[in-house]
């Protein structure tokens, strides 16, 4: 996306937009943000059961993508009823508000093994590694949602 913007190549930018919306990898927002909990303002990131370093890195990268697109007139912050905000609130609730009673949806991913095959890995609880680590990633989504959109982003 950034290369498409920098080089003024709309075809490259559009490829990134399409991948973000309907791609087949975890670069698609609805794969990176794995599950939206009904009746809450929370959505679980695909990395949540792995560890919090990867979870928060995902938040930072998604925020950058959303901001790049927003500056081009495409509002990914609002995509799927503010799905990214729900993921930020979920990650912040666990990492910064230190809530331990958050809902969790089991996630199974296909890990490559040393024999060239696939070994499924089941994540059935929130990953604790790196929990509470300070990362400079929440200012962007907080400002966008609370100051530009006037939405509640208290945990973010």
Language model features by range: what are they?
Residues 76-156:
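CBM-like carbohydrate-recognition segments
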